């Protein structure tokens, strides 16, 4: 593989919201305005060295061990599999809070791979990189699923037909805004997944499957009313809500303020809400944040289109 004539590359990868209420490990969308940045500076040897990790809350807890930090672990695996000898100094800027349910591990994995890819004269396609990003996410979650990594890399709203190997379906986007509210809590993905170990009744699975099918239909037919009726999480939310202080109160506040849907983003504690109008988005965001305040929780909010942009190169030189 011939190398490009550059010494450094910096890439950005967006935050994501996984599950979308009805698609556990299957659905996810990219979020505008927040994400992780990884800069790679080429070394004269083949070592990977993490020089700096900075940024959002929890960044100081991330590991400098290159086998256990997802950003370097995915680069190391890719280079080993392709038998490519390269070394980098690595600088990680976290825009996504640790344990927030906004795809932080996926974003670091994706940003690292996209930055690495810039060093090749003929870059690999994102399809060549995505399995490595999902691998990176699995190091944190303990499960090989791509509902964060795939929308993070490609953007938009995606349905995962398969995570291993990755097979995705790009879904139509409805004309709605997404409100993202992240309270000052942290939830480990592995612990959140442990709450789902007990079997579900078949009737619950059937009802949830109907919600998923109706949601997909609503997206293709652009039926906002059907989408609002269908985005009901009867599978995951009843077991995970207890991890998010004031969850049902915040959810009710979102609906009362005009949201057409509201649920948990990924493993939480971040919550998402869908709104029809831009003006409603600000009202819903404020209502959700005000309700979290009643539980003595500070929070951050973002407003995004569902057609969020995927990962991209910020600079190379």
PLM segments and residue spans:
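Short beta-strand-to-turn element immediately C-terminal to the catalytic PLP-Schiff-base lysine
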Residues: 41, 151-163, 273-276, 314-316
């Amino acid at each position: 593989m011939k190398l490009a004539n550059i010494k450094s590359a910096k890439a950005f990868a967006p935050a994501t919201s996984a599950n979308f209420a009805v698609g556990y490990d299957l659905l996810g969308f990219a979020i505008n305005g927040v994400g992780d940045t990884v800069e790679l500076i080429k070394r004269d040897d083949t070592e990977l060295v993490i020089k700096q990790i900075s940024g959002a809350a929890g960044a100081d807890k991330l590991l400098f061990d290159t086998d256990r930090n997802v950003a370097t672990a995915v680069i190391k695996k890719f280079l080993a599999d392709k038998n490519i000898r390269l070394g980098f100094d690595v600088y990680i800027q976290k825009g996504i809070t640790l344990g927030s349910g906004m795809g932080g591990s996926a974003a670091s994995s994706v940003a690292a791979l996209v930055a690495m890819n810039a060093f090749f004269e003929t870059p690999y396609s994102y399809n060549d990189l995505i399995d490595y990003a999902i691998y990176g996410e699995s190091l944190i979650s303990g499960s090989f699923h791509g509902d964060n990594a795939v929308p993070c890399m490609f953007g938009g709203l995606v349905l995962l037909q398969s995570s291993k190997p990755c097979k995705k379906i790009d879904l139509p986007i409805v004309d709605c805004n997404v409100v993202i509210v992240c309270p000052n809590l942290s939830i480990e993905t592995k612990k959140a997944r442990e709450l789902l170990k007990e079997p579900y009744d078949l009737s619950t699975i059937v009802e949830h499957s109907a919600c998923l099918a109706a949601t997909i239909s609503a997206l293709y037919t652009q039926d906002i009313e059907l989408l609002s009726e269908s985005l009901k999480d009867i599978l995951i939310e009843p077991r995970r809500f207890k991890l998010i202080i004031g969850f049902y109160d915040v959810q009710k506040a979102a609906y009362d303020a005009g949201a057409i849907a509201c649920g948990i983003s990924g493993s939480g504690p971040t919550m998402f809400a869908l709104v029809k109008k831009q003006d409603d988005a600000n009202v819903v965001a404020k209502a959700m944040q005000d309700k979290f305040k009643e539980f003595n929780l500070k929070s951050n909010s973002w407003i995004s289109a569902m057609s969020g942009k995927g990962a991209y190169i910020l600079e190379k030189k």
